[in-house]
């Protein structure tokens, strides 16, 4: 109460911040006449002037006012668009490294040019992040006209570019690209072996468009570069055949937590099925040998009970393709991890692809936190302001609209069943279509969009493609005639390619568009249709300039007329009179785009995004949600009580309840879900930060190594430290000579480096100390390496040292990632022992990292001591420069130490092998027993270093 009064009296913190920008806005406006008087050449020359001022000691903040005035003038001359005052404020928010919340149609794309230009003056590169390739290409080409006019270069990063093209794009002053491309380029760069092969040049400043989608919705999604493991498709198919045998009483499903678990009866049934199929080892399902089987049973259960076809994924071209729950878009190339994707493939009877091993990974949370300055734009961020600040230290600033919003957001209509709800939606669509009002129906899944499409088809409507000129001609003809044509388009993951065109024409009179969630986000829906879309499409192939000009004028007249029709498509509804009062009155509902939501999403933000498609730039509009007690949100969060209440109220079939209280109750349910999801993301980030800290150490180490011409000091230090650790292990400090494990030390030295070092004889010498023993071993190792340098030459050995060090580091880092994944999966169980899983994970992950570092010293030392260089005149088969190449039979990574040939001898008669002389072994298969007699597989013994 007091807070509300204070806000009314003094204004909110947001109001005060907006007010603080007004002085700079006034200064920019005051410069406008002066800048407008400049010639094109003089305006372009200001870029060099600003750079000179920066070099002389001025800051970017000092240059903000003249730089913004320059960009505004350049936009007027190139695009015919002038930045509004509120857009200048948006640009200032972005420059300060915060989030500008700007409503749909307020020109976020144009706003970004202000902060991009100003920060690009520093010469360190500015990255603009979009949600798909289409928007990246569109915005780079569109806004690139401003940058080019001012003498700045623009690059675009999209799927399918080679490294050379990517390097050129990143070298530009301003680079546009998708979040996926930026993240994967970073991971790929950190798998390169030469600095000149890397494509990115640092992380100075990024502006993230649709920042809520990328930093909130996709925050939990890790970017993973992986390589295939061994093929277990038959195993997945076998496991899948067991699931239909289970009854609902055999497992418990928790939809809120998205988890499923076998009951006691279910376990017994599965045990019997596994035993009969020969897949059960030992006596019980929960014996240690069956841990993997239990995991895959659980994944198969999840695939069948928690994941729905056409909602969570679709099947296309013999593949299971994930559907983004927030946008309804296909996530081509993305796969669920830990065997879940294979379980879905087995469920749908498509080809089961091999599981993958993680080679490199990072979450969007950690990738974007690497930038020195991060900013974002979106139409809906206020509901997630706490999360943006807690995780990214980004403040959300709500930018006022240029014109007041005149959209009417009506209360929800709640029906008892889905059938009643769909009937009400159909009736509402028909009423709107009769008055030529365009309608956008938002659905939460492909399945729901197709249910509505079927309903329209059964009621005399025809489905067309708004991206197809023939379909659009029918829509335009009906609009010109002022008669509804009963045509509709569907926009979901199945029709992703035509997304922008379908959305752009959703504002044509009589258009009915069914869209999953926020598909088509980033493309404005303009009342009457899109001039930018129609002109290129309808003038293509017209060569005569006069004919072309006439066509353009006709399109403009069309759109102006269509806009008037839509603006006047008002709805008159009767308001029931109170008892004893006069007859019913009528009230008008505005025209414009009518948004119909077919159900509430878990997040208020997604609902607000849907509403925000209507009422752009002061246009009228209308939005309403139609709900049923069968909807996921209502069902999961207590629809039983509501159903009882509605029954008691005497709600009849087909009737709806409409009340602000219902809206408030739903909002509270959504807030609970949002809070839970925030906690999940925050907790996951704490765990990922552990791996991220280690990732930074490894990636920084790789960069440092690649910068060095010679790593001889590094490998020498590693060699000496390895020897010190080995001697300390077998010859403890202050121990008596009789307590020394001399035999163990000698065997270990021979096993690792293949040298016969007489440590047993040295140990027998009177008065020898452990320091002397260590010094002699170090001397032998150093002399051995010096001999190799003398034999092959310093340049060759420097190359070998660097290659072996980098590739061994990569190989061990990949193995370490697998270990961390395994640790992460089981660490939660520590909570049952009253121990904090996060602290346990930190401690054990640090221990594993230390082990990896020790293993790195050992492996690099072993390889360099054994390395043989193939002379140039001999044929050599170097593996291609790939990240990985998996053996299809064993699943082993053949690229573990790629591009440094250790020159294995040809296979020899096994009987001629001397266990103590590796040079007599010839080529040994990785799965053979090691010829040294240890009893281990070669790949786990001497082959570990070969």
Swiss-Prot record:
| Residue ranges, compositional bias (Basic and acidic residues) | 907-917
The record's subcellular locations are: Cell inner membrane; Cytoplasm
Q: Gene3D superfamilies given for it?
A: 3.10.450.50, Helical scaffold and wing domains of SecA (1.10.3060.10), P-loop containing nucleotide triphosphate hydrolases (3.40.50.300), SecA, preprotein cross-linking domain (3.90.1440.10)
* CDD domains assigned to the protein according to its UniProt record, in alphabetical order: DEXDc_SecA (cd17928), SF2_C_secA (cd18803)
**PROSITE patterns per the UniProt record, alphabetical:** SECA, SECA_MOTOR_DEAD
Q: For Zn(2+), which residues are the binding ones?
A: 930, 932, 941-942
Name the needed cofactors.
Zn(2+)
Q: How is the cofactor bound?
A: May bind 1 zinc ion per subunit.
Report keywords, A-Z.
ATP-binding, Cell inner membrane, Cell membrane, Cytoplasm, Membrane, Metal-binding, Nucleotide-binding, Protein transport, Translocase, Translocation, Transport, Zinc
Which superkingdom does the taxonomy of this entry point to?
Bacteria
GO cellular component terms, semicolon-separated: cell envelope Sec protein transport complex; cytosol; plasma membrane
The EC designation for this entry is 7.4.2.8
Keyword Disulfide bond tagged: no
- Which Pfam families does the annotation name? P-loop_SecA, SEC-C, SecA_DEAD, SecA_PP_bind, SecA_SW
Gene Ontology biological process terms, A to Z: intracellular protein transmembrane transport; protein import; protein targeting; protein transport by the Sec complex
UniProt subunit comment: Monomer and homodimer. Part of the essential Sec protein translocation apparatus which comprises SecA, SecYEG and auxiliary proteins SecDF-YajC and YidC.
Q: Which PANTHER family match?
A: CHLOROPLAST PROTEIN-TRANSPORTING ATPASE, SECA INNER MEMBRANE COMPONENT OF SEC PROTEIN SECRETION SYSTEM
Q: What does this protein do?
A: Part of the Sec protein translocase complex. Interacts with the SecYEG preprotein conducting channel. Has a central role in coupling the hydrolysis of ATP to the transfer of proteins into and across the cell membrane, serving both as a receptor for the preprotein-SecB complex and as an ATP-driven molecular motor driving the stepwise translocation of polypeptide chains across the membrane.
What does the sequence similarity comment in the record state about its family?
Answer: Belongs to the SecA family.
**What is this protein's record name?**
Protein translocase subunit SecA
Task: Give the originating organism.
Answer: Rhodopseudomonas palustris (strain HaA2)
- Gene name of the record: secA
